[in-house]
């Protein structure tokens, strides 16, 4: 009436084999699709760096969108090459609040203003 003790393990093994065969069946159509794509596009995925045209453009160096980009890159290069100046000793660091008496006198301009007329 009761099944022998060893038959339960065999049923689990056959269930595992069915799952493995189902996984293999789902993998086989994927391999077939990959083979079709490789036949259709033989050069796809061979070069990790991209096309020859792209590699040639990258080897030529940086291209600039317009003159503004060029000038900004040029200014960055100049800033990197210049040595940094020492701290200015007359620089006000915020230790005190300036008063009108502490400020230097304003220089008068040589040209008379049209508004002051």
Curated annotation (Swiss-Prot):
It is found in: Cytoplasm. Signal peptide: none annotated. Phosphorylation at Ser-67 by GWL during mitosis is essential for interaction with PPP2R2D (PR55-delta) and subsequent inactivation of PP2A. Keywords: Cell cycle, Cell division, Cytoplasm, Mitosis, Phosphoprotein, Protein phosphatase inhibitor. Residues 1-53, 76-117 are annotated as: Disordered. Its main location: cytoplasm. GO terms for molecular function: phosphatase inhibitor activity; potassium channel inhibitor activity; protein phosphatase 2A binding; protein phosphatase inhibitor activity; protein phosphatase regulator activity; signaling receptor binding. InterPro entries: Endosulphine. One of its GO terms (cellular component) is cytoplasm. The modification Phosphoserine is found at residue 67. Pfam families: Endosulfine. GO terms for biological process: cell division; G2/M transition of mitotic cell cycle; mitotic cell cycle; regulation of insulin secretion. Residues 10-37 have a biased composition (Basic and acidic residues). Belongs to the endosulfine family. Protein phosphatase inhibitor that specifically inhibits protein phosphatase 2A (PP2A) during mitosis. When phosphorylated at Ser-67 during mitosis, specifically interacts with PPP2R2D (PR55-delta) and inhibits its activity, leading to inactivation of PP2A, an essential condition to keep cyclin-B1-CDK1 activity high during M phase. PANTHER family: ALPHA-ENDOSULFINE, ENDOSULFINE. This is Alpha-endosulfine. It comes from Gallus gallus. The gene is ENSA.
């Amino acid at each position: 009436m009761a099944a022998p003790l060893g038959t339960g393990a065999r049923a689990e093994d056959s269930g595992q084999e069915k799952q493995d065969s189902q996984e293999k069946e789902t993998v086989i159509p994927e391999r077939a699709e990959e083979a079709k794509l490789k036949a259709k596009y033989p050069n796809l995925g061979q070069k990790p760096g991209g096309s020859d045209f792209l590699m040639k453009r990258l080897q030529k160096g940086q291209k600039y969108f317009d003159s503004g980009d060029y000038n900004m890159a040029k200014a960055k290069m100049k800033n990197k090459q210049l040595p940094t100046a020492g701290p200015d000793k007359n620089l006000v660091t915020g230790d005190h609040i300036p008063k009108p008496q502490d400020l230097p006198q304003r220089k008068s301009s040589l040209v008379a203003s049209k508004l002051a007329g």
